[in-house]
């Protein structure tokens, strides 16, 4: 009965939408839900409701623990970039997202395996499929069946709610604002799965899919839809043409503000937040949400400051233009230029080169939030050269061959031409580069890297 019910809802969602409008399919995907379940059970994930249900159950035994470990050791994410696009303006294609898409679209795990051939090595794909097959029964017994009645009622009411709110109108608003494009014959698929946790929901979007966990007691559908639209707006931004991306990057480069590069990096999240959590929420709820829109101070603050300008452009059916970008950068400079000295902001977009691989874990633990992160545990001329061409915060940590490595760094940046340093003393040095990003050089002996950084920058 479950599969028939879900299929009917999915079809009714499509057939009530005209051919001229974007199509939205809503579905439950058991293979995807099992994938998320196993993923959340791995040791790299913090405590969660899936782990609570699994721990102490009949399936909490060596056989399944071994499968969880094997799943965690699989390499599922490979990427290919779009080098003709400005750095950071278009997300790379990631194979783990293609795998998730296939889990949503497949009719069975065997179908998933056939759809996914060539995305990852066959041995890994076969093992992944076998692990998901082994965990289908535990997932149903521990998660789906105990929450089945609540979830299926939620699914029906959510489907009706989505239809009543004309989601396609918000989608078109995003297309116009971002000056992006979408072929309306391609459906946007929304996959929902139950989450036995009352503390909130998660959402993500990729390609033509949005995925959201639904807490079994969730009834704030306005909040849920606004968060899902936030994720969908990311995809609309990602699908801007190369011409639009280059125009936007040129507008940032033409602006003389020292804040322009970091404003560019904040753009994607700030715009999705002001559109989804601000504009869409107000349209659904009738009033602007007075609580935080995003659980990160830089994104939240900028989104709220941008709200009047964004609503002005939406009301005028205007797309982002150079005047909008200049006004956005001015908001950053007038209100938030101090962020250029805050580590939590600077290290959100980071390229780290070090001669000590342990620094990766240390920085990841202390500064976990990143929108762009590159890391290399060898200091070489080729790596420094690559770093100089990447317009993000550049952090170089030297702990070993001090004289040679410091000399290499000095010769790689024109801004360091007159730099004087003492290689036998511990120090942290920083300077603003011509690409309007911070270069941070740490010559470390015994002091922890986080302590050295915090002595120079705000946290």
List the predicted regions and their residue ranges.
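Long, folded non-catalytic interaction modules
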Residues: 344-459
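Active-site scaffold of zinc-dependent metalloenzymes
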Residues: 112-118, 171-172, 189-222, 434-456
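Bacterial Sec-dependent N-terminal signal peptides
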Residues: 1-23
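Active-site recognition of the HExxH zinc-binding catalytic motif
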Residues: 222-243
